[in-house]
Amino acid sequence: GPMGPEEAGISNEIINRYYKSKPILGICLGHQCLGSVFGCVIGQCQNVIHGERSVIKLGDSPLFNGLDNEILAARYHSLYIKEANFNNSELRVIATLKDGTIMGIQHKIFPVFGLQFHPESILTNENGKKILGNFLKIVYGEVT
């Protein structure tokens, strides 16, 4: 959406209520909401990104099982989780742009993930389907 986490309706409340008991995958604004709930600073992009494919560097996460270290993925956003001084006791960074911009986060204990890019977009192709499939495996206990 065109708003920030503070205007995202009940999203933050849902995250707070369920993150310890239910797997969560936040995409785009959902990713920013997760960051906000866990104390990250949300910033305004210098340039609004609308329908661009970018190289995403993937880190170690069950969400990325079976994928290469880099994928092309769709981005549509004007806000992002600021990487400057990212030192979070509950979250870790699992995906970035080449310049270090945060594109993915994961809770250190619970199966809670945020992606700034869009795995569901046709621009992300088969890699996006694999990410969503990996999340379903996590939900159904086939992967930890």
Which sequence ranges carry the predicted segments?
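Flexible gly/pro-rich beta->alpha loop and the following alpha-helix that scaffold active-site loops
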Residues: 1-26, 38, 133, 137-140
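Pocket-forming structural segment of enzyme catalytic cores
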Residues: 17-19, 24-25, 32-113, 117, ...
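Short, charged, low-complexity patches
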Residues: 128-132
